[in-house]
Amino acid sequence: MEFINQTFFSDYSEGKIDTIPYALGIVLALTNGSRILKFINLLISLLRKFIITSKTVIGKFKIENNTSHQNDDIHKEYEEVMKQMREMRVHVTALFDSIHKDNMEWRMSESIRREKKREMKASTAENEVKIHTNDVNICDTSGLETEVCL
């Protein structure tokens, strides 16, 4: 059966069978359409259609025989997909953990930065008050006439 399959259903033989009607058509045109050549051309065209149909039927038969193997393939494919989904879940979890960690670090750095900014403003305000109190003349603010001011 394999020999017949290789002989009649190979791409090489189909290519040769496809060229025969064209060659016979040229011969028919040169011989003014002999009935024998027309009959041979018809037989070859029918044989070609039969071979193509047979090849299709054999292909369908092979597919039907492989359905038992196909169930195993479906289970293997399902397991493979589930394995990939588990791996993906691990990667996504790691990604979210990394994002969460980065977010927490950023929040901590922001709060530290704000605290330092507040401290700097407070120290600046204290320094301004000290400078302002040092510049103030006690005689101008008290309204008292003391020996120091005179």
UniProtKB/Swiss-Prot annotation:
Assigned keywords, A-Z: Activation of host autophagy by virus, Enterotoxin, Glycoprotein, Host endoplasmic reticulum, Host membrane, Host-virus interaction, Ion channel, Ion transport, Membrane, Secreted, Signal-anchor, Toxin, Transmembrane, Transmembrane helix, Transport, Viral ion channel, Virulence
List the GO molecular function terms: channel activity; toxin activity
Q: Where are the transmembrane segments?
A: 16-30
Side Lumenal, residues: 1-15
Give the CC-aspect GO terms: extracellular region; host caveola; host cell rough endoplasmic reticulum membrane; membrane
Q: How does it sit in the membrane?
A: Single-pass type III membrane protein
Q: What does this protein do?
A: Plays an essential role in the virus replication cycle by acting as a viroporin. Creates a pore in the host endoplasmic reticulum and as a consequence releases Ca(2+) in the cytoplasm of infected cell. In turn, high levels of cytoplasmic calcium trigger membrane trafficking and transport of viral ER-associated proteins to viroplasms, sites of viral genome replication and immature particle assembly. The secreted form acts as an enterotoxin that causes phospholipase C-dependent elevation of the intracellular calcium concentration in host intestinal mucosa cells. Increased concentration of intracellular calcium disrupts the cytoskeleton and the tight junctions, raising the paracellular permeability. Potentiates chloride ion secretion through a calcium ion-dependent signaling pathway, inducing age-dependent diarrhea.
Q: Which family does it belong to?
A: Belongs to the rotavirus NSP4 family.
Q: Return the HAMAP family for the record.
A: ROTA_NSP4
Q: What is this protein called?
A: Non-structural glycoprotein 4
